[in-house]
Amino acid sequence: MANKVTGSTDTSGALTTAPSIMKSILVVGTKKENSTTEIKENTIFGITGTADAKAAFGDNAVVEKIVKVFIQNGADYINGMILGSSETAMADALEASMADKSIKVIIPEGNDTKTIAALKDHLALCEKNDMFRYGVIAPTEEASATQTTLIAYGKTVDSDRIFIPSTLPTLNGAVVDPQVAAAGLGALIMTETDDPALPMNGVSMAGYSGLSRTMLETEMKILANNGITPLYLEGTAPTVYRLVTSCVTDESDHKVWQEGTTRFIADYVLETNENMLRANYKRTKNVVRILNAIKGDIKINMEKFEAAEIIENWDEATLTVTKDPQDMYGALVDYEFDVVTPLYTITITQHMKL
């Protein structure tokens, strides 16, 4: 029998991971009395704790509580922005926020119709500029009182990038401000979507001690089918039943973008591929060799996504990289993949131009 045996282990193929994307959460609010720091309006600044929020926003209890909920739910990269006083203050602030591409989630201090309209327009503008962001708007106590009022409220928001929690949480027996409620769901979107395909079902929020009302499962299903993210209690913690976008009025869009995971997956795949191409092809010739290299890099990324179970049914045959007939310096990239939801298998087609 041999008395010496040697060997080695090769782990080069043992791990499959998709690239992570830097992300931060932004709170936008008004400056109150007793602010102790001089920060200009519409300027992004970092927040590391509630003391920073109080110093910047002054006696703005809502913003301070929003930041506290962020921290309690693990959101550790927090930005703030102070609103101006003009009629277009929210729109102006959100436009200025585009200077920081790391911002993924926006929580405004208010939930009025003007704020919602500005947020919807901003999120749509960001998407057109390859910045993929989300917002959370919570209903007033009156709007969240019944299923009927909640569904009606959801129709006034109606966005595949805005989420609406169904019920206002309580803290020590008192119902919290709507946007303090929104902060919990916003923080979960920040911290629980590193794997964009992992459902949010059953994830609890910290920073609260109950819900203002509870619902039957059938009631929660109805809300989820109407653009409202239902919450239930797990012990004393508000917990996500099913994360859905508020996109409801367009039936075809509603079916595609109903599930939050579908929105997250589509954004994640497109953004990761775009970032990779920007990094690898800053200055190249538009020749067949480069087009083939681009195709190979996209193929590797898509295989990683499928191995990580982020996408399904990826078929290399759907991937094309061609010269842009309208632009001698441009290239066109197209591909398809599937996202499987509890109700549908959705085929996503993505297009890029270099």
Regions of interest found by a model, annotated:
Residues 1-354:
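Surface-exposed assembly/interface segments
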